[in-house]
Amino acid sequence: PVTLNEVAHSIFYAPQYTAIELGYFEEEGILLTLDTGFGADKTMTALISGNADIGFMGSEASIYTYKEGNEDFAINFAQLTQRAGNFLVSREQYDSFSWSQLKGSTVIGGRKGGMPEMVFEYILKKNGLTPQKDVTIIQNIDFGSTAAAFSSDTSLSDYTVEFEPHATLLELSGDGYVVASLGVDSGYVPYT
């Protein structure tokens, strides 16, 4: 048996779920167990501790583990996604959106040093904005709680960065509007 610990359970990883459901792993003689770590740090912990055989996460976790001097570090060997899978959600609906509109705003971002946050900051810089100077980024909200924080406290931020299904759920509830795709605006990156 092989235990795969994924960073998050998301439609973004549909190819993996399809392969599991269609029995492709079993056809190759792999009995796969799927666990969810809810964050690259937790997925890496599961991998290093032996609770997972494969960690499905962004490459940054491997780099951090190596830089900490761990002798039992992870080796990146495959790539499932080549773009960010998250979206910028605004409290306001725009006919036309430009990243420059974020100047002076507050955004619920991701964990400092995590792949979602690094890609978001890359896009800001690419559009002439300096993170934490031109745009205030909240980085202390748990990955699974950002959408709830955005919808429950309208004074907290102007925007949030969300994966599916949270981006769509915010739209359906009337609490936010998807205004940009980080995957489109960042271009190709070795995401997970």
List the model feature ranges, each with a label.
Residues 144-192:
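Pocket-lining segment of extracytoplasmic ligand-binding domains
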Residues 1-10, 30-36, 104-108, 136-138:
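Short, well-ordered beta-strand elements
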Residues 34-45, 58, 131-152, 162-165:
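Short helix-initiation/N-cap motifs at beta->coil->alpha
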Residues 1, 65-77, 125, 169-183:
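Ligand-binding "clamshell"
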